Design a protein with these regions (language model features):
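Glycine-rich phosphate-binding loops of nucleotide-dependent enzymes
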Residues: 1-258
Length: 258
């Protein structure tokens, strides 16, 4: 399979804390790739470095054969990497439709002048953006809430809305940070089906998730972080038998990196 993303020797320090140390992994086009580990293992830090929220102290990410810009989230999104967050970050006062439209605007060409003057091209782009946003709400199963304010949606539907907004940026890689957190069993099954649908439509998925059952039943390959280092990378069945992984989950004391 073709490599989509390669993490090369990623390191990140916060003062005297080594949050990530020499993390290398390869994600192939079309797979669902899981990133797991105990609390504080460095999973979200890895996401933050990948998506430009943090600048790595060591190493680089290569995406589609080109080095990703570091410390510049908008440029990372423009390259085709989108993410959701462990703590939901929606525009709470906007409608569900408006939230998704906001995600799609990175792919439109209207400048400030076009928006102010509402020229014909801008009006047409806005119509297409609205249409696409509604399609994505339908895709994730919440189109009936298109005009509802985001803050009034249920927790599970807010998660789906955040995924729809990320998909609106037209990513090649969708990075999901604990999307099943706070979901009940029914919502988790629906999420699994949605991720499989996203993968089936050609989008590669990188998944951080504490629900190990979900990860093992969904991911093609899994990497495990412990204290900022990669201790395993394999198919789920092999990772589950890995003694270092078992020891990491039973060892406890993981509090220093996220």
């Amino acid at each position: 399979m073709i490599t989509l993303l390669e993490a090369r020797n990623i390191g990140k320090r916060f003062g005297g804390l080594q949050a990530l140390s020499d993390v290398s992994l390869t994600i192939r086009k079309g797979e669902v790739y899981g990133l797991i580990g105990p609390n504080g293992a460095g999973k979200t830090t890895f996401f933050n470095v990948l998506t430009g929220a943090y600048t790595p102290d060591d190493g680089e990410f290569v995406f589609n054969g080109a080095v990703l810009p570091s410390g510049k989230p908008h440029l990372v999104v423009a390259q085709g990497v989108a993410r959701t967050f462990q703590n939901i970050r929606l525009f709470r006062e906007l409608t569900a439709l408006e939230n998704v439209m906001a995600g799609h605007h990175i792919r439109t060409s209207a400048g400030v002048w076009g928006i102010l003057t509402q020229n014909r091209h801008t009006v047409e782009e806005e119509r297409l953006t609205t249409e696409r946003a509604y399609e994505l709400l339908k895709y994730v199963g919440i189109e009936r809430f298109a005009t509802a304010t985001a803050k009034n949606l249920s927790y599970g539907d807010q998660r789906r809305l955040e995924i729809a907004r990320a998909l609106a940026t037209e990513p090649q890689l969708l990075a999901l940070d604990e999307p099943a957190a706070g979901m009940n069993a029914t919502e988790t099954v629906q999420l699994k089906n949605l991720i499989e649908q996203i993968r089936g439509d050609g989008i590669t998925v990188l998944l951080i998730e504490h629900d190990v059952k979900l990860v093992m039943g969904l991911c093609d390959r899994v990497a495990v972080l412990d204290f900022g280092r990669k201790i395993a990378e394999d198919v789920p069945a092999e990772v589950q038998k890995n003694e270092a992984v078992i020891g990491a989950y039973l060892g406890g004391g993981h509090k220093h990196a996220h």
